Amino acid sequence: MDAVLEADTRAVIGEGPLWDEENGRLYWVDILGSELHIFDPEEKINRSIKFKSFVTALAKYSKDELIMTMKDGFYLYHLRDDSLEKIKQPKDMHESLRFNDAKCDPYGRLWAGTTSMEGEQKQASLYRLNLDGSLVKIKDQVSTSNGLDWDRERNLMYYIDTPTQEIVRYSYDPQSGDVSNPEPVYRFDQSDGLPDGMTIDQNGMLWVALFGGSRVVHIDPFQKKEINSISVPAKYVTCCAFGGRDLKTLYITTATEQMTEKERYEQPHAGGLFSAQLETGGYQPVPFAGDV
């Protein structure tokens, strides 16, 4: 299966696609470009909003408000009047770190992890912003906190710390939000590229973007094997998320950051937003359900 181009944006690091059912559009970000993108699939129009700091991931809060992780913390963005409010910053947030991927769990808690901007290993963390506004560190000694998602039927959480080359499965308590019993369920070969963003479909199967691998791979975490893949005409595939009216469109983001001049010539649409139509759909993204 091949992905098709939706928006030719040449993002530095496209990331964080988030489907907004209420407004019928897709939000996504360019981390190093410090931009929020808004894509209208009906009109095939993509517009962007520039910020003064990195924008790394998104969660819906209300019809006209988003929770955004930016370089140093959590922010509330008002789409209607283009205003930004800081909500929370980890006490141990060092200036050499930045936030990376984030997503709300089935109960509306927002999980977000960090990464070192200097390539240091095991300096980052995974946090959870609770419904009461408290911020809890879930895991330290992380290198590049990346893809995460939840199996709603089986009360499981899947998580990727990119340099480990692994997808790790946890038991997940939906009432408390706590996770336990980590178990690696799939390991990528170095030749596959680096596992980056991830989403789950309604069968409990995983879709993982491979940075440097030009693919999104379909993984069965129970049989611990690759089922299928989507070819993307861009080397650095960063993230994927379900959207569209039937939630069967997989939106895929890509990057240009590490590309050579030769690669840029051969992959002119790298950094763009792509999509693939799938038979099995995903879940509606859960908005942040806490108070800000």
Swiss-Prot record:
Disulfide pattern: none
A single GO molecular function term of this UniProt record: gluconolactonase activity
Binding site for a divalent metal cation: 15, 146, 196
Family, per entry: Belongs to the SMP-30/CGR1 family.
GO cellular component terms attached to this protein's record: cytoplasm
One of the GO biological process terms: L-ascorbic acid biosynthetic process
Gene: yvrE
EC number annotated for this UniProt entry: 3.1.1.-
Cofactor: how bound: Binds 1 divalent metal cation per subunit.
Pfam assignment, any one: SGL
Gene3D superfamilies named in the record: TolB, C-terminal domain (2.120.10.30)
Subcellular location: Cytoplasm
Keywords: Cytoplasm, Hydrolase, Metal-binding
NAD among keywords: no
Entry protein name: Putative sugar lactone lactonase YvrE
Record keyword Cytoplasm present: yes
Main location (coarse class): cytoplasm
